[in-house]
From Swiss-Prot:
Tetramer of two alpha and two beta subunits. One of its GO terms (biological process) is phenylalanyl-tRNA aminoacylation. It catalyses: tRNA(Phe) + L-phenylalanine + ATP = L-phenylalanyl-tRNA(Phe) + AMP + diphosphate + H(+). Belongs to the class-II aminoacyl-tRNA synthetase family. Phe-tRNA synthetase alpha subunit type 1 subfamily. The gene is pheS. It comes from the Bacteria. This is Phenylalanine--tRNA ligase alpha subunit. GO terms for cellular component: cytoplasm. It is found in: Cytoplasm. Pfam families: Phe_tRNA-synt_N (PF02912), tRNA-synt_2d (PF01409). One of its GO terms (molecular function) is tRNA binding. Keywords: Aminoacyl-tRNA synthetase, ATP-binding, Cytoplasm, Ligase, Magnesium, Metal-binding, Nucleotide-binding, Protein biosynthesis. Its cofactor is Mg(2+). Binds 2 magnesium ions per tetramer.
Length: 343
């Protein structure tokens, strides 16, 4: 038995030394140390030896051989793994002196650029930027803004109701009411602009979308007049479209302002002489404005006998389309990088 054990040891150590990869080492672990290995079979015959001393001696020799084979396997496996790692590192070597690949820098979406520009203009004039929720209650979106039950603007064909009393806001005017009630709480002056997304039940085409943006402004104080409204709108228009642009206010109707006016700017394409864009009028419509209706002031916690205010609203999409000659509002949301990278 001793000769068998020593022969197995020598054979195993020689095979381990000649192993070419880690896979071969794993196979040898099973071959030389597994339950069905030749070594296990030889040691299984210890009980047939004639004396206790022989059984002890052969058992001790068998354990020494197991330990020697295990140590040899572990050492060779570590050696082969290290060699494989070095070979992989050599094959995947990276030249760290090469210049890095350029990374394309991101930039703000064109609408965000326009909205930020509008915010900068009004912040420089002493206004705050106020924002509010896009899912709104009927009262803040309609009732508080002098749009009672039965008004056409409440029609399900125009508004996106989520339930009987909750809808996606149709304008950012809800922010004005919430600011008056939750922030200002009767104090004056109030000078805010309210940018944000709004939603209408509309058919999408080159000039209409179900989701678009608005920027509204609100000023409340004693002695506020249409003259100061026109002054603020003139400053805004000239900051956006150039120092030579003019504005005019045309009588109109909005339920939350009285009197109400549409705001036009002199055509930036023909200088007011008349062209296809302005349809020969020399003027381009931008948005709506007017003096805050007394009912809206009351809903916001103000006494219309003590203070007055004005408000305006227009769409950043409309401004961007005029500034950059964009003809289709859908370009803003189609996520076409060929379009977006131009700005």
């Amino acid at each position: 038995m001793k000769d068998q054990l020593l022969k197995l040891r020598d054979e195993a150590l020689a095979a381990i030394a000649a192993a070419a990869d880690v896979g071969a080492i794993q196979e040898m672990r099973v071959r030389y140390l597994g339950k069905k290995s030749e070594l296990s079979q030889v040691l299984g015959g210890l009980g047939r030896l004639p004396t206790v001393e022989e059984r002890k001696a052969m058992g001790a020799l068998g354990n020494e051989i197991k330990q020697a084979i295990t140590a040899a396997l572990d050492a060779r496996e570590a050696e082969l793994a290290a060699a494989a790692l070095q070979a992989r590192l050599a094959s995947e070597r990276i030249d760290v002196t090469l210049p890095g690949a350029p990374v394309r820098r991101g930039h703000l979406h064109i609408l965000n650029q326009v909205i930020h520009r509008i915010e900068e203009i009004f912040i420089a004039m002493g206004y705050e930027v106020a924002e509010s929720r896009q899912v709104e209650t009927d009262w803040y979106n309609f009732e508080a803004l002098n749009i009672p039950k039965g008004h056409p603007a409440r029609d399900a064909q125009d508004s996106l109701f989520l339930s009987e009393e909750v809808l996606l806001r149709t304008h950012t005017s809800n922010t004005q009411i919430r600011y008056m009630l939750e922030v200002a709480r009767g104090r004056t002056p109030v000078k805010i602009i309210c940018p944000g997304r709004v939603f209408r039940r509309d058919f999408e085409d080159a000039t209409h979308a179900m989701m678009f943006h608005q920027v509204e402004g609100l000023v409340i104080d004693k002695g506020i007049t249409m003259a100061s409204l026109k002054g603020a709108l003139t400053e805004m228009a000239r900051a956006l479209f150039g120092p030579d642009v003019g504005i005019r206010l045309r009588p109109s109707y909005f339920p939350f302002t009285e009197p109400s006016a549409e705001m036009d700017i002199s055509c930036i394409f023909c200088g007011g002489k008349g062209c296809r864009t302005c349809k020969g009028s020399g003027w381009i419509e931008i948005g709506g404005s007017g003096m805050v209706h007394p009912n809206v002031l009351r809903a916001g916690g103000y006494d219309p006998e003590e203070v007055s205010g004005w408000a305006f609203g227009y769409g950043p999409e409309r401004v961007a389309m005029l500034m950059y000659g964009i003809e289709d509002i859908r370009h803003f949301v189609n996520n076409d990088m060929r379009f977006l990278r131009q700005f």
